[in-house]
Amino acid sequence: LVGSEMCIRDSYWTDFLFQGMFAATAATIISGAVAERIKIFSFMLIAFLYVAIVYPIVGSWQWGGGEFSTFTEDYGFYDFAGSTLVHSTGGAAALAGAIILGPRLGRFNKKGEAAAIKPFAASSIPLVTLGVFVLWLGWFGFNGGSQLAMGTADDAIAVSKIFINTLLAGAGGVMAAGAVTRLSGKTDVVQMLNGCIGGLVAITAEPLLPSPLAAIMIGAVGGIIVVYGTKFLFAMKIDDVVGAVPAHLFAGIWGTLIVPATNSGANFGTQLLGVLSINIFAVSYTHLRAHETSYD
């Protein structure tokens, strides 16, 4: 049945569902960064515009026979499962939204210093941890599913390697983020969890070709980027509630740019061009407007 004419003919709907999950994932990235200071209708509108316009256009550039898909053949732009096409674009839109909306009321004092941490602490660390584990489990579907086939032994072997590299990259992100925060004075569990996401995002651009050790290193750098990216946003007085921008935008850029290190068919210049073009397009469509009444 897998290779039958009926299966091939009707696979459009499977791909539609698969891409719909990618689009929904990107929209949730935006929600995390702008939480607590945007009206529900405003967010529904921006999510609709993103899912209906931004993601289909950006996705088609690489996966739908568009401009960047020709670069794949001629110059070598690769994004296997969406480090840039899904995560960086969502993170770029989230960054624009967080800047336009400004910080939550009381997040920073008049001197620009952080307010008391108590009102802004994570509500439940166990629930945050559970959520990250659910994401980690779902990532096997995202990365493994992007192989788009399981009908041959080669496909099955490829998917199994993708699973292993996805697991190792997430673990690398956790451990690296934990080590960095520990060296700074205290192990930060939330940063470790975000580091896991950063590691997973980083490996998503090319989860098939890296060796297991390379996957760990790619994920580890992604986790470190999350820690220092969070500090950078803090220094810039940008209030990203859940750390979506470092975990998705910054780590996604890293994961896309490092692809040529493990994929000889990729080209750094084209990877950089793709990252810049796609993220600029995503930011240009993020026209959020809010004021203090958005808290009401």
Predicted regions and their residues:
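Conserved small/polar residues in nucleotide/adenosyl-binding loops
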Residues: L1-D10, T286-T293
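Cytosolic juxtamembrane amphipathic/interface segments immediately preceding
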Residues: K111-A122
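Helix-coil boundary and interhelical linker segments in multi-pass alpha-helical membrane proteins
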Residues: T152-A153, T204-L213
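Metal/cofactor- and membrane transport-associated sequence elements
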Residues: S4-E5, R9-A98, G102-F108, A122, ...
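Cytoplasmic-side transmembrane-helix entry/capping segments in multi-pass membrane proteins
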Residues: S42-A47, D188-C196
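Structural signal for the N-terminal portions of transmembrane helices
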Residues: A158, I162, A266-V283
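C-terminal membrane-solvent junction of multi-pass transporters and transport-like membrane proteins
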Residues: D188-L193, K237-L257
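Transmembrane alpha-helical segments of multi-pass membrane transport proteins and ion-pumping complexes
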Residues: A24-G32, V51-S60, G91-I99, P103, ...
